[in-house]
Design a protein with these regions (language model features):
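Extracytosolic secretory-pathway proteins
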Residues: 1-179
Length: 179
């Protein structure tokens, strides 16, 4: 009987992190080092459960949770040159930097109270989600851990040679950097 109650779909909550804006504040050297925020990522957490419904969120599009992950150890760094069509080449037009293998963490973000939880998404159960989750929670009360994170960056090998059309040239070649 206890197992049926514990494993009931009424007790399960699915939480999905959703982006709600464009990442900002990218710092290349922070991505290659340690203990400095690499970028700012605005997100919200979408909670789903038969009782709280499908419109329950922690954070909103207008007031998101802002994550600022930072490397906890120095990542391994590698560079790969390739042509505009993606073929590896020592003298290619593009270079892709990979910073991999470091754990990343953020303990600085605040988390607002829940919204839209309950029947019809009207928020009748916001209080219950907040009570169970300890929300709202100030900066320093939350943590995000990313194990063996990877950060990638692609750029023109010699941006000066494409001047004054670096942006146009990069936009023609960017697809070759994707793997």
């Amino acid at each position: 009987m206890c197992d049926q109650i514990t494993n009931s779909t009424l007790n399960r909550v699915t939480a999905t992190v959703e982006p709600v804006g464009t990442p900002t504040d990218f710092q290349l050297f922070a991505g290659l080092g340690e203990k400095q925020p690499i970028l700012s990522i605005p997100v919200r957490v979408h909670l789903k459960n038969p009782l709280i419904g499908g419109n329950c969120y922690i954070g909103t599009k207008s007031s998101p949770i802002v994550l600022r992950p930072q490397n906890q150890t120095t990542p391994g760094v590698a560079a790969e040159s390739f042509t505009a069509n993606g073929t590896p080449a020592d003298t290619g037009e593009m270079v892709r930097l990979a910073a991999t293998g470091a754990g990343q963490e953020d303990t600085t973000f605040a988390a607002p109270g829940a919204s839209g939880c309950g029947p019809l998404g009207l928020g009748a159960f916001n209080w219950a989600v907040n009570l169970k989750s300890g929300l709202p929670a100030a900066s320093g009360k939350n943590s995000l851990t990313l194990n063996s994170a990877s950060t990638y960056l692609a750029t023109l090998t010699d941006p000066g040679s494409a001047s004054p059309d670096q942006g146009r040239t990069f936009s023609q070649y960017w697809h070759s950097a994707a793997k």
